[in-house]
From Swiss-Prot:
Keywords: Electron transport, Heme, Iron, Membrane, Metal-binding, Mitochondrion, Mitochondrion inner membrane, Respiratory chain, Transmembrane, Transmembrane helix, Transport, Ubiquinone
Subunit structure and binding partners: The cytochrome bc1 complex contains 11 subunits: 3 respiratory subunits (MT-CYB, CYC1 and UQCRFS1), 2 core proteins (UQCRC1 and UQCRC2) and 6 low-molecular weight proteins (UQCRH/QCR6, UQCRB/QCR7, UQCRQ/QCR8, UQCR10/QCR9, UQCR11/QCR10 and a cleavage product of UQCRFS1). This cytochrome bc1 complex then forms a dimer.
UniProt-annotated binding residues for heme b b562: 83, 182
Record membrane topology: Multi-pass membrane protein
Gene Ontology MF: a single term: ubiquinol-cytochrome-c reductase activity
Residues engaged in binding a ubiquinone: 201
Name of the protein in question: Cytochrome b
Function: Component of the ubiquinol-cytochrome c reductase complex (complex III or cytochrome b-c1 complex) that is part of the mitochondrial respiratory chain. The b-c1 complex mediates electron transfer from ubiquinol to cytochrome c. Contributes to the generation of a proton gradient across the mitochondrial membrane that is then used for ATP synthesis.
Miscellaneous notes: Heme 1 (or BL or b562) is low-potential and absorbs at about 562 nm, and heme 2 (or BH or b566) is high-potential and absorbs at about 566 nm.
Entry-linked CDD domains: cytochrome_b_C, Cytochrome_b_N
């Protein structure tokens, strides 16, 4: 009898994607983050769905509805903190996943890479809009500051901001539409994930060496399914520990104060996972220049495949490029720290130096080092 998994139209797709998929035998734990992101998305959609059953997107009741969820709904506090900290886990996995792609040269699969960048923007937009929904002080002022950046766009900027706000300030209309889009976007993200996987399965996975592994493949199941499940357990343990022991560790205390348009918090800042981009934005004195730098800090990933000058795909055998890569990681940590600090000396100059180095390393130092390594190969 023929295996139904190989004949049924739907099961056939699942079988070829998760069971009989040929995978390189040398994949390290850095290849776990794709599946971990899938779990994160699942957790966020499920917890978000149950939160949406009790949340009201009205400026008069939004803050109280979140309080009601935490106090009166059965395990509402758990849902709320799983959702809030699940977003942090999502971004940790996202940044590690992108870092893996940069280190091992996975960006040479340009379609998969570009869909990935699109996914990154979609998840960032979703997270930003989600942060506005509890309608605390940082929700309101964060929304005001970030949406106001669009006014830097020449000619249409002011009209565009008022169109997004649905009025002359962040108010009821803004909150309602942000809730609508925050609900919708994760499903668009899920669809994009399918496209991301479709393109990945066209080429097959990369591996740590960057060398084609067609002659050394193993079935995805049971080898990598077991490996992924171990990853799930580790991540869910970390998430549970964060949620149950210090749920507010990564949040902002100002968000426990209801939104007040007449009272500005002393330091307006986004969630920790946007701080590096926020630091780059603040390091440029010109508004339009800052906005362009902010967008380019992520969009620069799209030109990384063009800047790949090395004869080797992976950085595994390129110690000079490795040094630059880890310097880039250190700079991103520095920018994250600076983004959470007030705009005063010495933080301003540290942020500006780190921002310049961030772009210099990606645009100039890494390609130049790759060319030098190519030359050294001839020795």
């Amino acid at each position: 009898m023929t295996n139904i998994g190989k004949t049924h139209p739907l099961l056939k797709i699942i079988n070829s994607s998760f069971v009989d998929l040929p995978a390189p035998s040398s994949l390290s734990s850095w290849w776990n983050f794709g599946s971990l992101l899938g779990v994160c998305l699942g957790v966020q959609i499920l917890t978000g769905l149950f939160l949406a059953m009790h949340y009201t997107s009205d400026t008069a009741t939004a803050f109280n509805s979140v309080t009601h969820i935490c106090r009166d709904v059965n395990y509402g506090w758990l849902l709320r903190y799983l959702h809030a900290n699940g977003a942090s886990m999502f971004f940790i996995c996202l940044y590690l996943h992108v870092g893996r792609g940069l280190y091992y040269g996975s960006y040479t699969y340009s379609e998969t890479w570009n869909i990935g960048i699109l996914l990154l923007f979609a998840v960032m937009a979703t997270a930003f809009m989600g942060y506005v929904l509890p309608w605390g002080q940082m929700s309101f002022w964060g929304a005001t500051v970030i949406t106001n950046l669009l006014s830097a766009i020449p000619y249409i900027g002011t009209e565009l901001v008022q169109w997004i706000w649905g009025g002359f300030s962040v108010d009821k209309a803004t909150l309602t539409r942000f809730f609508a889009f925050h609900f919708l976007l994760p499903f668009i993200v899920a669809a994009l994930v399918m496209v991301h996987l479709l393109f990945l399965h066209e080429t097959g996975s990369n591996n740590p060496t960057g060398i084609p592994s067609d002659s050394d493949m193993i079935p995805f199941h049971p080898y990598y399914t077991i490996k992924d499940i171990l990853g799930f357990l580790i991540m869910l343990t970390a998430l549970s520990t964060l949620v149950l022991f210090s749920p507010d560790l990564l949040g902002d205390p100002d968000n426990y104060i209801p939104a007040n348009p007449l009272n500005t918090p002393p330091h307006i800042k986004p969630e920790w996972y946007f701080l590096f981009a926020y630091a780059i934005l603040r390091s440029i004195p010109n508004k339009l220049g800052g906005v362009l730098a902010l967008v380019m800090s992520i969009l620069i990933l799209a030109i990384v495949p063009i800047l790949h000058m090395s004869k080797q795909r992976s950085m595994m055998f390129r110690p000079l490029s490795q040094c630059l890569f880890w310097l880039l990681v250190a700079i991103l940590f520095t920018l994250t720290w600076i983004g959470g600090q007030p705009v005063e000396h010495p933080y301003i100059i540290i942020g500006q130096t780190a921002s310049i180095l961030y772009f210099l390393i990606i645009l100039i130092f890494m390609p130049a080092t790759s060319l030098m390594e190519n030359y050294l190969l001839k020795w």
